[in-house]
Regions:
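Short acidic, gly/pro-rich beta-turn/loop elements at beta-sheet edges
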Residues: 15, 49-51, 78
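C-terminal structural segments of small proteins and small subunits
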Residues: 58-96
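Extended, hydrophobic alpha-helical segments
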Residues: 1-34, 38, 42, 46-47
């Protein structure tokens, strides 16, 4: 399933920068960054549960927020890209 994840981490207080880096790293382990605080992830239900648990453990729920947008398996018809940065083919081959 295709999931769009966005986050807002308060960085003005102590520990904020660290939480921000950790949230970004967790997201990067599961998907592709498309904007500063937005990631596209293609995951199965088990991976999604693990991803959510990891992210929730990294944030301070009194100061930070996470949003999960579930676009399902037919996501290609729901996503439109306009402008700079060519879109990344989530299901294509990955060369490291």
């Amino acid at each position: 399933m295709f999931v769009l994840i966005s986050y807002d981490v308060a960085t003005t207080e102590e520990g904020g920068q660290r939480r921000l880096r950790r949230v970004a790293k967790v997201c990067k382990d599961y998907g592709q960054r498309v904007q500063y605080s937005v990631f596209e992830c293609i995951v199965d239900p088990a991976q999604l549960a693990k991803l959510k648990d990891k992210l929730i453990s990294e944030i301070d729920p009194k100061k930070d927020s996470l949003r999960f947008y579930y676009l399902g398996s037919n996501w290609q018809h729901r996503v439109e890209h306009v402008g700079a940065k060519e879109p990344f083919d989530q299901e294509g081959p990955l060369i490291v």
